Structure formats: structure tokens, C-alpha cells
């Protein structure tokens, strides 16, 4: 990681841009560079400024990506996964779509912004982190506690992100509906957690004289979880997602939205994968992922929990306490990070929409940006307390996220 950060720092230095690598562990760290606004609020208004621009000027724009990647088994790859082999217009390698490609895209945009000398109404930061794939203890989590220079006084990384707008990983892959390529933009994430139920035998213990009631109750708990339908909520992002795709299916009709009709139409034209994503964006889920039976006296049931933005720890505790009481079990919330939803229309995302139409549209085909709620989890989860608006967008041409990970040149 440090070698990659050093390389990025050299590129920035060649363009006269200062940056700093905040070392979080030997050979690991996070790089930050800044292009300051062309003016500051106390210096008066810039050209043609209005109240909306005044509000935006208070919020920095942060281009964020991570330089680390997950492991790769070379025998499963067509080309060595860390060789960045170029073949037939593609670059093959681990990280080409998660997220070295985003690092390159954001670095290029950052350099272009510095070179063209255009008026900037706010500070723009480039942040390249490490350790995202392993929990971010040495990455963004560590950076948030760093002290960084900012004008007249130093601030923490946490303060830097307060009320900021962030472009990070997530989305960018297109789905085709009619003659339109919709490039998905992650404007939110579901909350992610892990819950552990422990069901102990109530009656005689031991394999010879035991009643097996602990295991029986554990299996009933599993069946109960599997048949539950948790609360649902239609988020603004999801309503916009369904309505826009339905309009495209209907040939551009802009009539009154009907959620039931929208869902039915989309079910017919979307792929099975996209239908699953759409279903998940509309509901909370709890899924049993592991059953552990040390002995006949105790069974553990491990569950993955995905909650829509707006459902937090309090809702999760009420849900798990109810199940634990029903089946006479103990329950622990092992981990939980709250979800979030950023504004799905206007502002920064409006700028991304315009750029998508201009840069990715082709003859006979339209390109549009379409916000969605992700079921996965990334560094955006750390920014919920700071009320940052986080958008995951790294648009790519044809790509492959499996073994032989590759991105079009």
C-alpha cells in the first residue's frame, strides 16, 4: 500500500500539488491532498454566486477511494492477478474494479481540476485510503482521528467530513432497459449487522438422557427467522429508481406513479439479479448464516441482518429481544453499522447526471445515472455520524467483477 501511495504522491508533486501520507501502521497509510477554493467565505462572493452556492461552499468535496485489494488465487485467473496485463482492450488484475480504477479516475479528475484553473467554490480533497477490504482499522477509521491542517486551525479527519459531499466506491455498472443504459449510483447503503442467538437445553443435559429440547427450539427459531417478513419502507431513492425505469419501459411516459404497477412492469424486464436487488432495496432482512452445535446442551444461531436506512440499533434490539424471549434464548448483537441515504436528486448528483449523459451516451443510446441503495457495506458507513452525503459512483464500460477481474480501456 505504501508503495502505491508513494507513487500517487510523486504524480501529485510533479504537478505542483502538495499531499501528505498519514502512516497508520508500518507500510500502511492514507494519502490526502487538497485543492483549495478559489475564494473563502469571508472574502466575499465569487462570480454569479447565489444562496445555493453559498451553502455548497461550506461543504468540501472529497474524492475517496481505497488502494488495497482482496487476496487472489493465481490458479483461478487467466492472467497473473497482480500483473495488470493488457489484452484486447482490457486491463486484467485484482483491483481493476475495486477500487484502483476509481483511484485513477479521481486522480485524473483532481489533476485536471488543478490544471484548468477554473473557479472553485469550495475545497476539493483527494483521499486514498488503505485497509478497506479488512475493516478499515488502518484506513478511514484511523484517518478520522488524524489531525490535519485546515486554514487558521488544525482539525481532525472527522471534522473534515462533517456535512461534506463524498464521491466514493459503489455503482457505476450499467443496466440496459430499452435504448437506455442506466449507470447505477450508490446514494445509500443498508445497515449491516451480525446477531448471535444461544439456545441452551432447559431439561436434562447430556446425549444419553437429554431431551434435545435445546436443538429443537433452535431449529424452530431458525424456521421462525426464515418465515419472517420484516417491516418494509419505500425510500425516496427506491421510489425514484422504480419510477424512472418504469417510465423507460413505457416508452418515456411520465404519468402518475403507481408503485404496484411499477414493480410489476420491472419484474418482467429486469434480470433475475436486478430483481433481487430491487426486492432487497424495499425490505429489511434477517438471514441465518451459520448453526453451531458444540454439544447437545447448547446451540448457537448466527444471523446476517440488513436494515434499510432509518432502522437502527433500537429496532434491531426490539426484533432480536422478541425472538429471544419467544424461544427462550440469549441474544447478542455482535456488530451493527447503521445505513444511510443521501439525497437522490439535485445538487452534486445532478452534476453527475449531466456528466453521465454527456460522456457515456452513444449514437442511438442514451446514458442516465440512476441512484440505488446498496446491500453491501463500504467506508461510507463510518461517515453517518458526520452527516456526509456519500455517493458511490465509478462508471465503467464493459467490466468483469469475478475471477479474471478486468476493466475496459
Regions found by a protein language model. Give the residues of each.
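Acidic/His- and Gly-rich active-site-bordering loop/insert found
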Residues: 1-94, 103, 113-122, 303
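Fold-independent oxyanion-binding glycine-rich loops
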Residues: 25, 65-67, 88, 130, ...
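Metal-dependent amide/peptide-bond hydrolase catalytic core
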Residues: 46-51, 172-181, 186-188, 192-409
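Glycine-rich phosphate-binding loop signature in dinucleotide/nucleotide-binding domains
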Residues: 56, 158-162, 363
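Structural motif
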Residues: 60-62, 90, 164-166, 389-390
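Acidic/histidine-rich catalytic neighborhood of metal-dependent amide-processing enzymes
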Residues: 91, 97-186
Amino acid at each position: 500500500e505504501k508503495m502505491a501511495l508513494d507513487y500517487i504522491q510523486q504524480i501529485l508533486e510533479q504537478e505542483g500539488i502538495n499531499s501528505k501520507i498519514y502512516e497508520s501502521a508500518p507500510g500502511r497509510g492514507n494519502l490526502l491532498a487538497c485543492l483549495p477554493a478559489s475564494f473563502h467565505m469571508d472574502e466575499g462572493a465569487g462570480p454569479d454566486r447565489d444562496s445555493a452556492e453559498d451553502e455548497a461552499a461550506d461543504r468540501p468535496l472529497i474524492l475517496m477511494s481505497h488502494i488495497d485489494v482482496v487476496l487472489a488465487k493465481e490458479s483461478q485467473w487467466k492472467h497473473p492477478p497482480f500483473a495488470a496485463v493488457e489484452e484486447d482492450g482490457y486491463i486484467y488484475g485484482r483491483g481493476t474494479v475495486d477500487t484502483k480504477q476509481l483511484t485513477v479516475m479521481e486522480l485524473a479528475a483532481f489533476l485536471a481540476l488543478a490544471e484548468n484553473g477554473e473557479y472553485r467554490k469550495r475545497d476539493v480533497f483527494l483521499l486514498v485510503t488503505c485497509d478497506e477490504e479488512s475493516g478499515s482499522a488502518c484506513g478511514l477509521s484511523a484517518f478520522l482521528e488524524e489531525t490535519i491542517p485546515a486554514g487558521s486551525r488544525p482539525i481532525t479527519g472527522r471534522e473534515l467530513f462533517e456535512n461534506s459531499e463524498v464521491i466514493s466506491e459503489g455503482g457505476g455498472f450499467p443496466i440496459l432497459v430499452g435504448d437506455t443504459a442506466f449507470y447505477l449510483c450508490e446514494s445509500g447503503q443498508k445497515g449491516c449487522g451480525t446477531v448471535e442467538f444461544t439456545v441452551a437445553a432447559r431439561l436434562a443435559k447430556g446425549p444419553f438422557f437429554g431431551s434435545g429440547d435445546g436443538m429443537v427450539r433452535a431449529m424452530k427459531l431458525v424456521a421462525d427467522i426464515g418465515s419472517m417478513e420484516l417491516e418494509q419502507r419505500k425510500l425516496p431513492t427506491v421510489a425514484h429508481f422504480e419510477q424512472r425505469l418504469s417510465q423507460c419501459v413505457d416508452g418515456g411516459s411520465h404519468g402518475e406513479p403507481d408503485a404496484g404497477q411499477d414493480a410489476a412492469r420491472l419484474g418482467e424486464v429486469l434480470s433475475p439479479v436486478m430483481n433481487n436487488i430491487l426486492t432487497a432495496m424495499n425490505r429489511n432482512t434477517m438471514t441465518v448464516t451459520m448453526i453451531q452445535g458444540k454439544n447437545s446442551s447448547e446451540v448457537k444461531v448466527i444471523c446476517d441482518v440488513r436494515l434499510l436506512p432509518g432502522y437502527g440499533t433500537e429496532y434491531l434490539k426490539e426484533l432480536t429481544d422478541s425472538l429471544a424471549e419467544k424461544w427462550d434464548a440469549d441474544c447478542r448483537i455482535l456488530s451493527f453499522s447503521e445505513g444511510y441515504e443521501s439525497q437522490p436528486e439535485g445538487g452534486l448528483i445532478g452534476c453527475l447526471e449531466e456528466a453521465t449523459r454527456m460522456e457515456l451516451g452513444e449514437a442511438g443510446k442514451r446514458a442516465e445515472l440512476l441512484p440505488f441503495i446498496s446491500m453491501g457495506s463500504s467506508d461510507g458507513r463510518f461517515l453517518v455520524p458526520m452527516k456526509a452525503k456519500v455517493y458511490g459512483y465509478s462508471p465503467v464500460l464493459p467490466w468483469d467483477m469475478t475471477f479474471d477481474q478486468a476493466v475496459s480501456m
